[in-house]
Design a protein with these regions (language model features):
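N-terminal nucleotide-binding beta1-loop-alpha1 segment
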Residues: 1-14
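Short, glycine-/small-residue-rich phosphate/pyrophosphate-handling segment
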Residues: 143-164
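Short phosphate-binding loop-to-helix
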Residues: 58-94, 154
Length: 220
């Protein structure tokens, strides 16, 4: 799931230290690197759930071959997730939604989550993020109650979702915890990680410039 860079405000919490153009370039790199990673997985159908709908022609030109496009529906994240799973599970036996904000996430974990759902090992798969949310959520059947009255954009998203899932009698499996990039501290962590261990192609190409920008921001 992603906002289309250039059509919606992206990475607003990183402006400053980044300019609007730098934030847009970063979000684009994150998105395309994530799509490349999903396309490389076997046994999955890669789809980009995007907003706003007007971005479809641009995203169709940008997305790797084999990636389908699906415009998000609904108001607010909870309603959008509900609609997304309604759409996907009408045609597929399981679906796993991913963020586009954790570019160095090991894609083997995504494959593990997809396999858990496909093999019937869980009703819900969640990939926790360090900020208290999740980088992934997967389902085998639509479940609107899982996304209703959740305190989105807080550190209680994962906790609330787990409590809700268990109250509904759903079998939950957790994937490893990872970080997403929303704040200046997150961006520094990403740049340090790429400098030490590398990263996906587009994001890694931007990392030296971003690290220099962060260093200038500290000096200034």
């Amino acid at each position: 799931m992603a906002k289309a860079p250039g059509f919606a405000d992206v990475k607003s919490r990183l402006q400053p230290p980044l300019t609007a153009g730098e934030a847009r370039a970063l979000a684009t790199a994150f998105l395309l690197d994530r799509l490349d990673g999903v396309v490389a997985l076997s046994g999955v159908v890669p789809l980009l759930a995007f907003t706003p709908p007007a971005a479809a022609p641009v995203l169709r030109a940008l997305a790797p071959a084999g990636v389908g496009l699906l415009a998000q529906r609904g108001d607010g994240l909870g309603e959008r997730l509900t609609c997304l799973f309604d759409d996907l599970l009408a045609e597929h036996r399981a679906a796993l939604a991913l963020d586009a904000d954790s570019p160095t996430l090991p894609m083997t974990w995504v494959a593990e989550g997809a396999a858990m759902l496909a093999d019937g090992m869980a009703d819900v798969v969640l990939g926790p993020s360090e900020d208290g949310g999740y980088w992934s959520v997967g389902l085998r059947a639509p479940c609107p109650a899982l996304f209703t009255d959740v305190p989105w954009s807080t550190d209680r998203v994962l906790e609330t979702t787990l409590v809700r899932a268990r109250a509904l009698g759903l079998r939950v499996r957790l994937l490893p915890r990872w970080f997403d990039v929303d704040t200046e501290a997150d961006l520094k962590k990403l740049c340090d990680e790429i400098a030490a261990s590398g990263g996906p192609r587009r994001t890694a190409a931007l990392a030296p410039t971003l690290a220099a920008r962060l260093a200038r921001a500290v000096v200034e």
